[in-house]
Amino acid sequence: MNLKDYIATIENYPKEGITFRDISPLMADGNAYSYAVREIVQYATDKKVDMIVGPEARGFIVGCPVAFELGXGFAPVRKPGKLPREVISADYEKEYGVDTLTMHADAIKPGQRVLIVDDLLATGGTVKATIEMIEKLGGVMAGCAFLVELDELNGREKIGDYDYKVLMHY
């Protein structure tokens, strides 16, 4: 199945000069959505994953069904002020400044094998901050999986030597 057939391209969104890759059509098509989830599950199966971590919000959409299929837990990564209990945080650089991500301080137990699942790998800031928090909690990085990678932004450099899977490259 060619998943790119289910990605909408919107020019100059959210601002001039940006090409936005919209995964909504993929999510709206049951066959394409399940195919994408199965591809990530297949990648994760041999990694003996205990926990899926997904950054908000589209990481939830992709990560939760992967966790369900694997019989693993799911831990959300959110912006500050969105999680109700004690959190840890990590800062990351965006195009115009610094932002912060958080996750519950008890989300990962030491030694748990963790797979990060998200819709998009762009500059890599989100995944780098997420890796930092997982390692701070004693988690073992099993890898990362993304629906889409924007190759020209070199986000893969922020993943370092960790294994990762991408379903579509742009």
Curated annotation (Swiss-Prot):
Q: What is its main location?
A: cytoplasm
Q: Which InterPro entries match?
A: Ade_phspho_trans, PRibTrfase_dom, PRTase-like, UPRTase/APRTase
Biological or metabolic pathway of the protein: Purine metabolism; AMP biosynthesis via salvage pathway; AMP from adenine: step 1/1
List localization entries.
Cytoplasm
What keywords would UniProt list here? Answer: Cytoplasm, Glycosyltransferase, Purine salvage, Transferase
Which Gene Ontology terms of cellular component type are present? cytoplasm
EC number(s) of the enzyme? 2.4.2.7
Q: Which GO terms describe its biological process?
A: adenine salvage; AMP salvage; purine ribonucleoside salvage
Listed under catalytic activity are: AMP + diphosphate = 5-phospho-alpha-D-ribose 1-diphosphate + adenine
Task: Output the Gene Ontology terms for molecular function.
Answer: adenine binding; adenine phosphoribosyltransferase activity; AMP binding
Q: Which Pfam families match?
A: Pribosyltran (PF00156)
Q: Which residues form the signal peptide?
A: none
Q: What does this protein do?
A: Catalyzes a salvage reaction resulting in the formation of AMP, that is energically less costly than de novo synthesis.
Indicate the quaternary assembly: Homodimer.
Similarity annotation = Belongs to the purine/pyrimidine phosphoribosyltransferase family.
| HAMAP family tied to this protein | Aden_phosphoribosyltr
Task: Please state what the protein is called.
Answer: Adenine phosphoribosyltransferase
Q: Which organism is it from?
A: Streptococcus pneumoniae serotype 19F (strain G54)
Taxonomic lineage of the native organism: Bacteria, Bacillati, Bacillota, Bacilli, Lactobacillales
